[in-house]
From Swiss-Prot:
Residues 227-331 form the PH domain. GO terms for cellular component: plasma membrane. PROSITE patterns: DH_2 (PS50010), PH_DOMAIN (PS50003). Strongly expressed in hepatocellular carcinoma (HCC) compared with their non-cancerous counterparts. InterPro entries: ARHGEF39, DBL_dom_sf, DH_dom, PH-like_dom_sf, PH_domain. It is found in: Cell membrane. It holds the Pfam family PH. This is Rho guanine nucleotide exchange factor 39. Keywords: Cell membrane, Guanine-nucleotide releasing factor, Membrane. Residues 22-197 form the DH domain.
Length: 335
């Protein structure tokens, strides 16, 4: 039944018109960006993957490590684009969702891909020359292979934004409303899983870096399974005597205090010796001074069952960042 309005303006009809304009604008953006995305996928598939296969410059395991599921993702885009061009958004995106697992696989391989690229550029002269030659093609517009490799993960975020907007601006009586709503949900769930994979990879990188900075028997396995939050120098204020600089590494469950090795140490110069581990679940944190945000720095008090730490910094902003990170770590252990 059509709604009729006695006046010249009808709020319901105006709202529908706004939805339709937003829907049309979003659909147009999805189509235009998909064309560009598919073009870039095709450039890599043609000028890198295809030629590398033909020339044998990289062995199949190395090629697979570098590009992962790229060709299958390219195929999924080739399936989707005709539906978008024909205005069959719901049907096209419903079919596209069957390929979302490819993006999970691509994300899980992304760190290995970047590592393989750097290793091969360093040690494989033929591959290095080939990459430079292909990157110089005008079709790439100055983009390097390392800039193009994250493209599918960037596109997944665009998919989420655009498909969610498309679903939100599609009325419940539209024939493709259910298809678009389901596609938006599945794409958002995939984007969240990919984000989680990326966060874990970044954390693993931090843990390897921190573990490499620690030396000595006590340091073995200290970072295994932990979630890194921050690190930096702070001054430890003892009951008597002068404050001593120490390096601190904060994880969600512990605060690690480390002392720098002597610079002239034959084997371990530039590393740190672990001096203490403080459990965040048993920590009570307070600011002794440094609440005002002034230029004079501040002092934090960390109380544990058998010890109390006073940590000082002359940088007020840095101390505030530490305070917020410590607060978050303590809260995460008590929830």
């Amino acid at each position: 039944m059509e709604l009729s309005c006695p006046g010249s303006r009808c709020p319901v009809q105006e709202q529908r018109a706004r939805w339709e304009r937003k829907r049309a604008c979003t659909a147009r953006e999805l189509l235009e960006t998909e064309r560009r995305y598919q073009e870039q996928l095709g450039l890599v598939a043609t000028y890198f993957l295809g030629i590398l296969k033909a020339k044998g410059t990289l062995r199949p395991p190395e090629r697979q490590a570098l590009f992962g599921s790229w060709e299958l993702i390219y195929g999924a885009s080739q399936e989707l684009l005709p539906y978008l061009e024909g205005g069959c958004w719901g049907q096209g995106l419903e079919g596209f969702c069957r390929h979302l697992e490819l993006y999970n696989q691509f994300a899980a391989n992304s760190e290995r891909s970047q590592t393989t690229l750097q290793e091969q550029l360093k040690k494989n002269k033929g591959f290095r020359r080939f990459v430079r030659l292909q990157e110089g093609r005008p079709e790439f517009g100055g983009l390097q292979l390392q800039d193009l490799l994250p493209l599918p993960l960037q596109r997944l975020q665009q998919y989420e934004n655009l498909v969610v907007a498309l679903a939100e601006n599609t009325g419940p009586n539209s024939p493709d409303h259910q298809q678009l709503t389901r596609a938006a949900r599945l794409i958002s769930e995939t984007a969240q899983r990919v984000h989680t994979i990326g966060q874990k990879q970044k954390n693993d990188q931090h843990l390897r870096r921190v573990q490499a900075l620690l030396s000595g028997r006590q340091a073995k396995g200290l970072t295994s399974g932990r979630w890194f939050l921050r690190q930096g120098w702070l001054l430890v204020v003892p009951p008597h005597g002068e404050p001593r600089p120490r390096m601190f590494f904060l994880f969600t469950d512990v605060l690690l205090m480390a002392k720098p090795r002597p610079p002239l140490h034959l084997l371990r110069s530039g590393t740190f010796a672990c001096k203490a581990l403080y459990p965040m679940a048993q920590c009570h944190l307070s600011r002794v001074f440094g609440h005002s945000g002034g230029p004079c720095g501040g002092l934090l008090s960390l109380s544990f069952p058998h010890e109390k730490l006073l940590l000082m910094s002359t940088d007020q902003e840095e101390l505030s960042r530490w305070y917020h990170s410590l607060t978050w770590a303590i809260s995460s252990q008590k929830n």
